[in-house]
Regions:
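Conserved strand-helix element at the start of the C-terminal RecA-like helicase core
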Residues: 2-5, 106-135, 142
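Conserved helicase motor
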Residues: 4-10, 122-125, 141-165, 182-184
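SF2 helicase catalytic motif II
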Residues: 5-8, 16-60
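SF2 helicase motor core recognition
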Residues: 8-20, 63, 127, 167-199, ...
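Residues immediately C-terminal
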Residues: 35-38, 67, 187
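Interdomain hinge/linker at the junction between the two RecA-like core domains of SF2 helicases
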Residues: 64-111
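Conserved SF2 helicase motif VI
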Residues: 206-233
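The feature captures the C-terminal accessory region of ATP-dependent helicases
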Residues: 252-407
Length: 407
């Protein structure tokens, strides 16, 4: 019987009605077990069946991208870690592009495209903005969760319905020249295509930390979606030195201190001398971050703890490009080729020049600021910006070329 973790209680109910002894007569296999950790922060019910899972006499978990699990019941019940090692070259060649302006490279990839492209970006608004900015609405499809689908369709009704195709389920006939996939389609989903598309993953932490991709899980799972392979695999990413990069030991210590504080306040709460004191202590207890790491019963949710640690460790990699390089070099799943392209301007700078909601003075100041950073000889990206700026305000570009910044 195949079911989602959230629907497993229905199987138990049916088995009870039929007098079937599931725990002793059936084998329980949890597939894509990494999702128990990766998804528990927004799919709380995904780990509820685990108490039943441990009651099975015969059981196992499996994943192509496993995450170490800290729940003590695994050790208590003698679980073993079995690794299947291939005897052939299975690693994915990947181009890792570090930049401060992902949009330039997305535009370049689309401009040079000779085959369909699959973009994997964990922020639907980002996908939509790329599509609108490049004017590729009629050639694009977005595959996302139902709520995101409704939001995009609502946004389109507020303006002009520009023909973006938005779906919450994937089918091959819905594929387009440019295809954008949100996190809903990163794993547990197969694309069996007659052709091999180019695959582009985008992480723009300067725009949003929600675009962060875990190199050891998300990126591997994404590469595995194309069952017949792909033509090329690229990860375009930014970094941000403002992101904290804690060690695992520091995160574990933080959780322990939060737990100690929670237990202390809990003791005071249980022995509160009055309803007022109980309310104040209850509010204080609920504000403790540790409450997100326990079940309603008060028991520790080890999967939530693992999620907390994993999330911070993954996010911390995007503090510095060298950490990303190291993660890719240490990965067993990729053969990375590294590139770096730091531009004198970002996409946000370019939009100041382009959009109508900025004054002429603001636009001219930004154009001069950007042009002043260019060095001779101009590269193709510099030339592209100069051409765009010349189209928007030829006078200021000509003045800069003749007189320079100081004028």
């Amino acid at each position: 019987i195949m079911t989602t973790p959230e629907s497993l209680p229905k199987v138990f109910s049916a088995a009870e009605n039929l007098k079937i002894d599931l725990f002793n007569e059936w084998f329980c296999l949890m597939d894509e077990s990494h999702l128990l950790v990766k998804d528990v922060d927004y799919r709380e019910d995904i780990v509820l069946p685990m108490s039943s899972f441990f009651q099975f006499q015969n059981k196992a978990l499996v994943s192509a991208t496993p995450i170490e699990l800290s729940d003590p019941r695994f050790k208590e019940q003698g679980f073993e870690l079995l690794e299947v090692v291939a005897n052939y070259e299975y690693r994915y060649p990947i181009t890792v592009m570090h930049t401060n302006n992902p949009f330039i490279h997305i535009r370049e990839i689309i401009k040079k495209a000779e085959r369909p492209i699959c973009f994997f970006i964990n922020l639907v608004d980002y996908c939509y903005s790329v599509i609108k900015e490049l004017g590729i609405e009629n050639e694009s499809s977005i595959f996302c969760a139902p709520k995101s689908q409704m939001k995009i369709k609502h946004d389109m009704t507020l303006g002009e319905d520009n023909g973006v195709n938005v779906y919450d389920e994937w089918r091959e006939e819905r594929m387009n020249k440019y295809n954008f996939f949100s996190a809903r389609f990163f794993s547990a989903f197969d694309m069996d295509l007659e052709y091999k598309p180019d695959v582009v993953m985008v992480t723009d932490v300067k725009k949003s930390v929600y675009t962060i991709l875990d190199i050891n899980t998300d990126c591997v799972q994404i590469a595995g979606r194309l069952r017949r392979g792909f033509n090329s695999l690229t990860h375009i990413l930014t970094t941000d030195d403002a992101i904290a990069s804690p060690k695992q030991s520091e995160l574990e210590e933080t959780i322990k201190l939060q737990e100690n504080a929670y237990n202390y306040i809990r003791t005071l709460y249980d022995n509160a001398p009055s309803e007022i004191a109980k309310k104040i202590l209850g509010d204080t207890m609920r504000s403790n971050p540790f409450t997100k790491l326990i079940f309603p019963s008060g028991a520790k949710n080890y999967f939530a703890i693992d999620n907390y640690i994993n999330e911070y460790l993954v996010k911390g990699l995007y503090q510095d490009y060298e950490l990303i390089r190291e993660a890719y070099m240490n990965s067993d799943m990729f053969i990375p080729k590294f590139k770096e392209n730091i531009q004198p301007y970002t996409e946000e700078d370019r939009l100041v020049v382009k959009r109508a909601n900025y004054s002429v003075k603001q636009k001219r100041m930004k154009i001069v600021e950007i042009l002043s950073k260019f060095e001779l000889p101009y590269n193709e990206y510099d030339i592209a910006f100069i051409d765009e700026a010349r189209h928007i305000d030829p006078l200021i570009v000509e003045a800069f070329e003749l007189l320079g910044k100081e004028a």
